[in-house]
Amino acid sequence: MLKPVSEWIKHSFQTVENVSSDSLEQLLKEDRDRVVLVDARSQAEYEVSHIEGAVRVDPDASNMDNVVQQLGLPDVQKENKTVVCYCTVGYHGSQMAQKLSGFLANGSGRHEVLPRVYNLEGGLVKWANERKEIVDGRNKPTALVHPYNQVWGQLLEPELRASF
């Protein structure tokens, strides 16, 4: 049931590149310092669980200069960074990736090497359903995910759904 949702999101954000959960997991194992993880969900969702090391950014943020500062991207001018945005299933992650990549491209004078910006395909739902590692707000391992709403909650394995 997640696949049609992911396809709809890809169709809605055709300029956004997606990275698979397996590719991100491998990249994190190989070179975690090169990856900037952006969690584009609410604080309540982030507190239930997130990918370790992710920086939570308000999904409705419109001031991308502030977002870039929050992520530490002004300090990576000569580094080859990969930015991966995610949310519950990929919609807000794709929105954030689109805004961020557009902002960085338009302000490219600041960066000698532009970071690659992706959306995590399937979002945290796919990541958790595959039993990949997530942590709670205290950085303790957890398996639970805030489902965002009842519809997206149906995409999570029942034992992974946090009550909200």
Put a short name on every predicted segment.
Residues T88-S94:
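Gly/Ser/Thr-rich loops at beta-strand to alpha-helix junctions
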Residues D39, Y86, L120:
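Active-site-adjacent beta-strand anchor residues
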Residues R34-V36, G53:
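A generic secondary-structure signal marking the coil-to-beta-strand transition
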Residues V36, T82-V84:
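Structural motif
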Residues M1-D22, A44-T82, S94-F164:
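Rhodanese-like catalytic fold shared by cysteine-dependent sulfurtransferases
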Residues V16-N18, L27-R32:
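Eukaryote-specific, low-hydrophobicity, charge-rich regions
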Residues L24, V36-R41:
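Short hydrophobic beta-strand that contains or immediately precedes a catalytic carboxylate
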